[in-house]
Amino acid sequence: MLRNIYYALSPQLRLFVRKLVYWPVDLFSPKNNRIPPKGLIYTGRGDFLQAGKYWTNKFIEEGGLLPDDKLLDIGSGIGRMAVGLTSYLKTGEYEGFDAVKQGVDWCQINIQSKFPNFQFKYVDLSNDLYKSSGIDASTFAFPYPTDHFNFAISVSVFTHMLPHEINNYLAETARTLKQGGILFATFFIIEKDPINAR
């Protein structure tokens, strides 16, 4: 019931409630500039650093990510993937964009300032989970040149989008990836019989 009430709130109000609820935890937790305050983590759960390491290993082992690749993080959030990648992409480049300004600001201050090969951009996109106004994701052009990246990641992004928005993001990803580039993405699997899909 509380979850239903929470998601009935506007995206801006949900972020405010989250900051308020986690304020005591954030106030008394030891400060670690590799982990954002809990009140700012607007998506994902579990151990922040462990999740970043887990996905970095997946990108390397299953996707073939190389230390000198140019990587695009579609929906970079509050830097969960980026923090895990900082120890691996030593000679590569990382570009991430997201629609939540607080997340991008945190990443610029705590990651980009220490790792100049990691860049974060705020994009004014509309998304019913995070922001009720902005550019329509179905017409959004990624702010990067054609044939620029070797590797793109999109973890838990397409699960928050509508099919016509996903189609545009896939087209933009294809445009910005070099020939032979890799997209490592997560999706929901829709089965004909969801009850017995397991």
Predicted region positions:
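Helix-capping/helix-break motifs at membrane-protein junctions
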Residues: 162-163
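Class I (Rossmann-like) S-adenosyl-L-methionine-dependent methyltransferase catalytic domain
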Residues: 2-62, 78-85, 93-141, 168, ...
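A conserved beta-strand element that flanks and buttresses the S-adenosyl-L-methionine
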Residues: 153
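A short glycine-rich, Lys/Arg-flanked "PGG" loop and its adjoining helix->strand segment in the class I
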Residues: 167-179
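Short catalytic micro-motifs in class I SAM-dependent methyltransferases
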Residues: 156-157
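Short glycine-centered segments of the SAM/dcSAM-binding site in methyltransferase folds
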Residues: 70, 181-182
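Conserved class I S-adenosyl-L-methionine
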Residues: 68-77
